[in-house]
């Protein structure tokens, strides 16, 4: 009873004790959550994986079939599973159920009176818990706390910010009081000691990720209920062996640590018996043996373990279902993993050394293999993979053979893109394959892709295919990509009922085929091919998108029945007509830019169309655009001279953006005021720049919603229409003719206004814009003042330029040294002959740029110039005109010059005269000019003989000479000569003497020249011997030679010869020497030839020793040998050379005796007697070995035989002989003892050295002892290796063994990025396995000192140059804040420096590092200077067709002319240089000057004007019903050339029209309309000379154009022999035969005319012609269709009693023009109506077949008169 009572009492007290905690209660079962922080590491890993996933799928098309998408989703789920973080999203949970709060048997009891700060030493931990438990965000940690409050918490999130944040936790002391914790998140902190949580046995989930100081997991061993553990991203964590015994742990995440060796041992039982998932990504594992001991391991993630070379050690992990070994870059082989029978997925992506996957076989449950981006060359067999569904082998560049991919009955996805496959192979037995990716390989054929009944996705893009074959056995194909191959024909793409995506782009396709039976097709891509016809695109009810851009398309077909087509792109083709673009109810976008379109049709019934681009075409007008109710964007730019009309634009009322730049709108003036745009009230953007001809913009006044308007480069003067456009924000009006901008003053929303290149001189209307901060650019204005000033030397004008505040803007510069003062500009001392002067203005302030040039025209005074003086002779006749010409008189502007020459100068009187020259223009008298005219006496005339002869050595004076040549002048003036200096009487020859004279005025006579001849001496005669003989090598000079041959002359003249050059005394032979002599007068003797004989050289004798010895291997050449045997020749000089066969006979490496023969031969063929020498080569002596007697080595020493020989100082006295020993075979350095080693040697001659023995002693080893400094410090960021650390602490081992190496954990135990103290442990083990005692060393990382900043003292930038703060730091070469320093440099550059204003600015640079150290600031001066000269770029040449419409603006566009400065205009001489109507190459120069007056370097562009072939003109001939009556013809010509054609004659029809036109880019047809002709009647009359009928008239009828022939009939009592012929015309004709009274008959003769071909075959009926004997006849060949006459086409002769035959021979024509009418006989002009033809009966009549039609016209009315005359004259003749 007492016991029960006690329990009740205790219960009451316990409830009373817990009462204060009622404030924590939220509800019966509710959870109070104060933080919801997810684990940052989990986010990072997920983001990383997501990034990799996105990167990997960027190249995949969005249009993949659903099956492919499902596969992709599966892969993504798997990726998410791989990166799962077990302790993510832990929320703080406080348990409010008092019955569950355990306060008995507590392991740690909270001391009474505790506060959070006292219980938890870490201030951050204390404060966080205080906030969590009290619910007060302002808690400080000084609040009271007891066990109950802590025991109420079951889930706690204490994750930090970065692990390096001031609020992060570094000490978790106190957490031991939270004994009811089941979930704890301590990620992103600075925790290194886990001891406080070692007894929290209720923990199920623990997150310790991203604690950079955590080096081990000591403390987790007792967490027996732990199921999830996250220790990822702990870079110092190497060992996780403490988890090995956790009995229920199911999941470990240890990715991104520093684990190299995975040691998992549990002596007490099974190792991690329940572990299913192990995350070990991004470590440095090399061995996976421990993982094979985990009995339930299913999922293993070892991605990014770069040192892992094989998976073979996993063989025992038989429960594994998933292995992710991606990015294990050292993985070379999988090893034997055949035991992993439950494996379902293996991922090997990015294993860049993995060359084979041959072990992936016999895995019955394997579903997914992903091995992309490896180095796989060999697939092995891939046998027995019955469940494999996904095989990813992409980007294995060396994989060429895929024959192993067969017999996989469940395979659905096969990715082989980016490999090196050249042949597909068989792909047998893949019945369920749905997706096949083969892009980016080297395939030339895909004919093997067949019998894949479920294939829905096929990508073979980026290969070398030339054909795609039939593909008939792919009935379910939905997605096909064959782009980027070499296909020319894809016509087999028909009858694919499921195909919804086709991509054939980037090939060379010309033929697409009919593309029938593709009912499911949604998207078709054929861009970048050679397709010319896409008319097959019709009747495709599901087609949504077509891209056929960048082809050669001319025919786009009808586009019928495309109800769902949304996007159509045919840009960059050769399309001329798009009139079929209508009735497409779903079309939204239409791209047709860069074509040749001239006809766009009506473009109606396109209710969904929102975007149209027709730029770069030849569209003449936009009038055809119909009702497009949703069109928002219309671009018709760059149609240039073709687009001249807008039409009404009444069907596009919803248009928001209209771009019409670079056209010729209003070229003809028909567009008026742009009223066609006035109803487009929804427009917000309008671009009409570069139309060039727009002047009236009043039609834009209603566009009240406009925000952007560009009217650049037109002819606009008046902009008042813009005053109501109050929504305008940006307006561009550059390059127009605007003077007044007051209309813009109230546009309050305008924030950017461009007015450059106009005629504005008053900018004050822009004041409101400038004051509110808008940008106004009005540079490069050009204005010419209207008043032309006249002046004498100076003039003044008022300054007309007004600044925005209304005040005059002072000039920035004034030409011709003008000055500015008080608002006036004055020019003085104007002397230049110019028509104008100018001044510039330029100011930039408050966002306004205003600059330009004002030109002031003026008339300047005339200035006259002339020569200072002019000379004439008395009696000259000179007019004033001639005088002005003689003195080169000119005026500065070409005005006439006058003078007083005629009145001032007397040309008959000697003296000097001053003449005044003047000029006048526009009433302004010019400056006068004075010329001195001198009138002088006439020059004397000299006469003398032209030649004279003197004897040599004669004595002649100048006076005597003048007398001898009869020299005199007409004025008796003195004559002077150069006789005494020019003539040498002591030397024969011809000399020229000059005679001069001058009158008293100094006027000189014309010089006369006399030739003086001094007679010469006769030629000398040489005498000498005819030949002479010398010994070879004798020495003779030319003088000795002449002496030897007794050479002499008869007059003592010197003899010369070519002895020195002609004779070679060192070479035997006969030489010819020529002797010459010249006397003192230069007269040469006859040359004399002398023969010089040089005798042959004597034979020499050889002497030498008879024998010579050499050591073996002696280095002796032939020269040395001859020297050694003292070989010599007794003759000197001699050409004989000693030679021997020493080098071919003697072998110095082979001992023996050799006989050497010495010979000598001179150049003249003399051979000396040979000399023999015996040469003995001696053998090598036996070698001798020397060495130390013994040597000692420590145990375990590593000594090679070579080192041993070196150590014992083993030497041998003979090189190339090797000492050998039994050291390596007999001496064991791992075993102490004495060993005998024998040294031997044998030379190459087989002689052995005496053996030498050496004793080798091997010592025993010692235990190492480590010594080192106890402490050391380093600067933060120092780059210290472990080797350097060991050196710095003087670490050594006492045993002195080189194999004993000291190791440490220096690299893992220290972090040079964080200043603090670290403990490093040193270890060493000798080769006997004895370990040294570990030694601890304290390493202190010092705090980072403040960075020392250095930079240039100043830097300069151009005005307006774009410079960031980063650029500024780089430009001043800032140093001190670069890595590894954490100091971050800052400056006030952006706030201090105004780059739009020139001047100097002081910028201050500061820096603070992460340890809080502040650098000393430094200052830099920034100079902002004027802009540099602009730079022009342009194409090297531009081509135009002759007559093409272009101008300077178009030229600049076509040449892609650009300049690197805004608001700087490029100027050209295009208009002056280029004649577009004349073929040729012209050079155009581009120039530019910026507002600072700096000129760009000129750029030259070649403009090539060529003839352009135009489209043909068809000529048709039709009757009144439109039926063709003659073959059509074709006219061709060059573009813009005119053509004119007359209607041709067509039998039976009439047309008198002439049609003309101009050849153009469009094929044209002209039609001649003919009227049928009713034929007229030909009446034949028979009359006598008086006009009386002698027989009844006859009539001939027929079709117009038919030939007719009429012959005079026989009439009794009358005579007439005539035949008339012609053609029937539409007018009646009359032919009259005139008869004479019959006379007594005369004998007649007969001519038979025959017409045959070249073989004699008859071509036409023969014709007989008769006439009186002795009368002459003339017959002509008949015109026969298809034949031409061979030879003469006429014959003449005389009728005789004997019958005659004339035969015309024809040959067949090779071709008859279809365009020429066929002619029977010669073309005849029919006689006009009622013309009477009278034929003389005494004249041989024409045959009719060959008469010209002009005959009737010629004889016409005159024939009667001619006939009458003949009638009257003929009888007299007969009498």
Curated annotation (Swiss-Prot):
Keyword Ligase in record: no
Which residues comprise the propeptide?
A: 1744-1775
Q: What UniProt keywords apply to this chain's record, in alphabetical order? A: Cell wall, Leucine-rich repeat, Peptidoglycan-anchor, Repeat, Secreted, Signal
User: What segments bear the compositional bias annotation Low complexity?
Assistant: 36-50
Q: Where are the LRR repeats?
A: 152-176, 180-201, 202-224, 225-247, 248-269, 274-295, 296-318, 319-341, 342-364, 365-386, 387-409, 410-431, 432-453, 454-475, 476-497, 498-519, 520-541, 542-563, 564-585, 586-607, 608-629, 630-650, 654-675, 682-704, 705-726, 727-748, 749-770
Domain MucBP spans what residues? 1507-1566, 1572-1631, 1641-1702
- Its source organism is Listeria monocytogenes serotype 4b (strain F2365)
The reply on keyword Metal-binding is: no
Family under the similarity heading: Belongs to the internalin family.
Question: Which positions does the motif LPXTG sorting signal occupy?
Answer: 1740-1744
- Report what the protein is called: Internalin I
The organism's superkingdom is given as Bacteria
Q: Where is the composition biased (Basic and acidic residues)?
A: 58-85
Residue ranges of region Disordered? 36-97, 1713-1737
What is the residue range of the signal peptide feature? 1-28
Described function = A role in virulence could not be demonstrated.
The record's section on InterPro entries has: Cu-Rt/internalin_Ig-like (IPR014755), Ig-like_fold (IPR013783), Ig_E-set (IPR014756), Inl_IR (IPR012569), InlI_Ig-like (IPR044056), Leu-rich_rpt (IPR001611), Leu-rich_rpt_4 (IPR025875), Leu-rich_rpt_typical-subtyp (IPR003591)
**Residues the record lists as Pentaglycyl murein peptidoglycan amidated threonine modifications:** 1743
Subcellular location, record wording: Secreted, Cell wall
| Domain (LRRCT): residue spans on this chain | 782-869
GO cellular component term of the entry, any? extracellular region
Q: How does it sit in the membrane?
A: Peptidoglycan-anchor
């Amino acid at each position: 009873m007492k016991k029960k009572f006690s329990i009740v009492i205790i219960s009451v007290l316990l409830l009373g004790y817990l009462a204060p905690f009622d404030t924590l209660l939220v509800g019966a079962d509710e959870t109070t959550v104060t933080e919801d922080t997810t684990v940052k590491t989990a986010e990072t890993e997920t983001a990383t994986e997501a990034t990799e996933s996105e990167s990997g799928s960027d190249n995949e098309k969005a249009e993949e079939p659903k099956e492919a998408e499902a596969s992709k989703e599966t892969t993504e789920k798997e990726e998410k599973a791989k990166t799962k973080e077990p302790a993510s999203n832990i929320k703080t949970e406080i348990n409010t159920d008092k019955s569950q709060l355990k306060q008995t048997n507590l392991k740690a009891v909270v001391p009474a009176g505790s506060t959070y700060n006292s219980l938890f030493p870490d201030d951050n931990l204390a404060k966080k818990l205080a906030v969590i438990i009290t619910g007060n965000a302002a808690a400080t940690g000084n609040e009271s706390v007891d066990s109950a409050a802590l025991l109420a918490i079951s889930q706690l999130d204490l994750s930090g910010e970065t692990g390096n944040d001031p609020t992060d936790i570094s000490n978790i002391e106190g957490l031991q009081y939270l004994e009811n914790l089941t979930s704890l998140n301590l990620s992103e902190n600075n925790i290194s000691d886990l001891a406080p949580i070692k007894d929290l046995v209720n923990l199920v989930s623990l997150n310790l990720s991203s604690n950079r100081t955590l080096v081990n997991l000591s403390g987790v061993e007792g967490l027996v209920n732990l199921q999830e553990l996250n220790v990822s991203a702990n870079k110092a964590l190497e060992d996780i062996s403490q988890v090995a015994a956790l009995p229920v742990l199911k999941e470990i995440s240890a990715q991104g640590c520093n684990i190299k060796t995975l040691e998992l041992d549990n002596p007490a039982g099974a190792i991690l018996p329940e572990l299913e998932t192990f995350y070990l990504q991004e470590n440095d594992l090399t061995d996976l043996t421990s993982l094979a001991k985990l009995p339930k391991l299913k999922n293993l993630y070892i991605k990014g373990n770069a040192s892992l070379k094989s998976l073979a050690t996993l063989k025992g992990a038989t429960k594994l279902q998933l292995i992710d070994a991606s990015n294990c870059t050292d993985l070379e082989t999988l090893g034997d993993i055949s035991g992993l029978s439950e494996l379902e997925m293996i991922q090997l992506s990015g294993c860049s050394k993995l060359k084979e996957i041959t072990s992936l076989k016999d895995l019955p449950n394997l579903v997914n293999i992903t091995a992309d981006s490896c180095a796989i060359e060999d697939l092995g067999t891939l046998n027995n993979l019955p469940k494999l569904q996904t095989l990813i082998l992409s980007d294995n560049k060396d994989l060429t053979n895929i024959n192993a991919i067969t017999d996989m009955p469940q395979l659905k996805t096969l990715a082989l893109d980016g490999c090196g496959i050249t042949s597909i192979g068989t792909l047998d037995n893949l019945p369920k394959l749905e997706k096949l990716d083969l892009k980016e390989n080297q395939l030339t054929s895909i004919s093997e892709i067949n019998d894949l009944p479920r294939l829905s996705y096929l990508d073979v893009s980026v290969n070398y295919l030339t054909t795609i074959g039939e593909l008939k056995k792919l009935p379910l194909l939905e997605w096909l990509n064959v782009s980027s191959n070499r296909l020319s024909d894809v016509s087999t793409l028909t009858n694919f009922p499921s195909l919804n995506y086709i991509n054939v782009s980037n090939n060379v396709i010309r033929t697409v085929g009919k593309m029938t039976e593709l009912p499911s097709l949604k998207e078709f891509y054929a861009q970048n091919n050679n397709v010319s016809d896409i008319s097959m695109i019709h009747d495709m009810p599901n087609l949504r998108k077509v891209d056929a851009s960048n082809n050669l398309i001319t025919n786009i077909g009808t586009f019928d029945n495309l109800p769902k087509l949304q996007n159509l792109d045919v840009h960059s083709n050769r399309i001329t007509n798009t009139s079929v673009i209508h009735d497409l109810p779903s079309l939204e976008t239409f791209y047709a830019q860069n074509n040749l379109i001239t006809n766009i049709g009506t473009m109606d019934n396109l209710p969904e169309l929102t975007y149209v681009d027709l730029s770069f075409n030849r569209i003449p007008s936009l009038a055809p655009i119909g009702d497009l109710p949703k069109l928002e964007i219309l671009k018709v730019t760059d149609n240039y001279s073709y687009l001249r009309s807008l039409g009404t634009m009444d069907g596009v009322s919803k248009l928001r953006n209209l771009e019409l730049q670079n056209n010729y709108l209003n070229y003809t003036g028909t567009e008026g005021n742009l009223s066609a745009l006035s109803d487009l009230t929804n427009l917000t953007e309008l671009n009409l720049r570069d139309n060039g001809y727009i002047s009236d913009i009043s039609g834009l006044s209603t566009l009240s919603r406009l925000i952007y308007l560009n009217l650049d480069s037109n002819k606009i003067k008046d902009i008042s229409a813009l005053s109501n456009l109050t929504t305008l924000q940006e307006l561009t009006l550059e390059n127009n003719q605007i003077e007044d901008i007051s209309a813009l003053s109230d546009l309050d929303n305008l924030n950017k206004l461009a007015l450059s290149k106009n005629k504005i001189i008053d900018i004050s209307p822009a004041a409101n814009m400038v004051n509110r901060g808008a940008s106004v650019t009005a540079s490069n204005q050009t204005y010419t003042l209207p008043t032309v000033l006249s002046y004498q030397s100076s003039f003044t004008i008022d300054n007309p330029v007004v600044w925005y505040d209304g005040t005059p803007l002072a000039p920035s510069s004034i030409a011709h040294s003008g000055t500015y003062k008080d608002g006036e500009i004055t020019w003085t001392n104007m002397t230049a002959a110019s028509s104008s002067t100018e001044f510039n203005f330029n100011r930039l302030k408050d966002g306004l740029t205003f600059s330009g040039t004002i030109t002031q025209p003026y008339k300047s005074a005339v200035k006259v110039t002339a020569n200072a003086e002019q000379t004439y002779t008395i009696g000259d006749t000179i007019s004033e005109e001639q005088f002005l010409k003689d003195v080169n008189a000119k005026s500065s502007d070409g005005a006439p010059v006058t003078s007083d020459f005629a009145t001032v100068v007397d040309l008959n009187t000697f003296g000097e005269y001053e003449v005044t020259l003047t000029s006048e223009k526009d009433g302004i008298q010019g400056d006068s000019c004075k010329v001195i005219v001198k009138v002088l006496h006439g020059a004397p005339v000299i006469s003398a003989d032209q030649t004279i002869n003197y004897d040599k050595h004669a004595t002649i004076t100048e006076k005597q000479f003048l007398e001898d040549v009869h020299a005199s002048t007409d004025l008796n003036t003195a004559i002077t000569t150069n006789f005494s200096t020019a003539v040498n009487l002591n030397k024969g020859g011809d000399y020229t003497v000059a005679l001069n004279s001058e009158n008293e005025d100094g006027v000189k006579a014309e010089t006369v020249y006399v030739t003086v001849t001094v007679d010469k001496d006769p030629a000398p005669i040489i005498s000498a011997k005819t030949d002479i003989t010398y010994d070879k090598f004798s020495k003779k000079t030319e003088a000795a030679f002449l002496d030897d041959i007794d050479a002499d002359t008869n007059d003592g003249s010197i003899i010369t010869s070519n002895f020195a050059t002609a004779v070679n005394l060192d070479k035997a032979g006969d030489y010819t020497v020529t002797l010459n002599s010249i006397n003192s007068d230069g007269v040469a003797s006859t040359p004399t030839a002398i023969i010089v004989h040089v005798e042959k050289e004597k034979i020499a004798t050889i002497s030498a020793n008879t024998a010579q010895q050499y050591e073996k291997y002696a280095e002796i050449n032939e020269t040395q040998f001859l020297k050694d045997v003292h070989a010599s020749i007794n003759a000197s000089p001699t050409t004989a050379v000693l030679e021997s066969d020493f080098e071919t006979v003697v072998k110095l490496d082979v001992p023996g005796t050799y006989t050497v023969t010495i010979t000598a031969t001179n150049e003249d063929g003399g051979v000396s007697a040979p000399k023999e020498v015996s040469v003995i080569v001696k053998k090598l002596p036996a070698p001798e070995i020397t060495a130390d007697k013994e040597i000692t080595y420590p145990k375990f020493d590593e000594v090679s035989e070579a080192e041993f020989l070196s150590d014992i100082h083993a030497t041998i006295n003979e090189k190339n002989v090797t000492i050998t020993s039994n050291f390596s075979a007999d001496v064991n350095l791992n075993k102490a003892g004495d060993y005998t080693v024998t040294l031997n040697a044998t030379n190459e001659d087989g002689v052995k050295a005496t053996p030498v023995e050496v004793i080798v002693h091997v010592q025993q080893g010692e235990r190492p002892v480590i010594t080192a400094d106890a402490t050391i410090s380093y600067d933060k960021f120092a780059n210290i290796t472990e080797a350097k650390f060991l050196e710095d602490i003087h670490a050594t081992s006492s045993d002195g063994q080189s194999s004993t190496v000291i190791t440490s954990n220096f690299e893992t135990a220290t972090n040079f990025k964080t200043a603090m103290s670290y403990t490093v442990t040193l270890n060493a083990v000798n080769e006997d396995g004895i370990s040294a005692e570990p030694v601890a060393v304290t390493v202190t990382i010092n705090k980072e000192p403040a960075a020392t900043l250095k930079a240039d003292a100043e830097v300069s930038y151009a005005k307006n140059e774009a410079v960031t703060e980063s650029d500024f730091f780089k430009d001043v070469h800032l140093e001190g804040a670069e890595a590894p320093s954490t100091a971050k440099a800052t400056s006030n550059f952006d706030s201090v420096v105004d780059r739009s204003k020139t001047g100097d600015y002081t910028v201050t640079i500061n820096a603070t590092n992460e340890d809080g150290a502040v650098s000393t600031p430094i200052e830099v001066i920034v100079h902002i200077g004027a802009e540099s000269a602009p730079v022009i770029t342009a194409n090297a040449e531009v081509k135009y067709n002759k007559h093409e419409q272009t101008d300077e603006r178009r030229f600049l566009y076509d040449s892609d002319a650009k300049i690197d400065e805004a608001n700087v205009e490029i100027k050209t001489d295009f208009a002056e240089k280029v004649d577009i109507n004349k073929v040729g190459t012209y050079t155009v120069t581009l120039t530019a000057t910026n507002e600072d007056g700096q000129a760009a370097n000129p750029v030259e562009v070649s403009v090539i004007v060529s003839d352009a072939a135009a489209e043909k003109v068809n000529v048709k001939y039709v009757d009144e019903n439109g039926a063709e009556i003659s073959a059509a013809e074709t006219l061709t010509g060059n573009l813009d050339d005119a053509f004119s054609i007359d209607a041709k004659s067509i039998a039976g029809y009439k047309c008198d029209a002439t049609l003309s036109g101009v050849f153009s880019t469009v094929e044209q047809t002209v039609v001649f309309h003919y009227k049928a002709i009713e034929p007229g009647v030909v009446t034949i009359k028979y009359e006598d000379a008086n006009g009386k009928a002698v027989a009844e008239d006859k009539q001939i009828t027929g079709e117009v154009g038919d030939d007719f022939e009429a012959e005079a009939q026989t009439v009794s009592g009358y005579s007439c022999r005539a035949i008339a012929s012609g053609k029937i015309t539409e007018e009646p004709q009359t032919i009259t035969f005139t008869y004479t009274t019959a006379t007594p008959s005369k004998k007649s003769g007969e001519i038979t005319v025959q017409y045959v071909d070249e073989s004699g075959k008859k071509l036409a009926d023969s014709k007989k012609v008769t006439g009186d004997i002795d009368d002459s006849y003339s017959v002509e060949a008949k015109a026969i269709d298809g034949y031409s006459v061979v030879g003469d086409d006429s014959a003449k002769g005389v009728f005789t009693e004997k019958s005659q035959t004339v035969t015309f021979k024809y040959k067949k024509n090779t071709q008859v023009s279809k365009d020429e009418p066929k002619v029977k006989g010669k073309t005849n002009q029919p006689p006009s109506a009622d013309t009477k033809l009278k034929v003389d009966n005494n004249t041989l009549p024409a045959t009719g077949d060959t008469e010209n039609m002009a005959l009737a016209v010629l004889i016409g009315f005159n024939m009667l008169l001619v006939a009458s005359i003949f009638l009257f004259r003929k009888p007299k003749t007969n009498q």
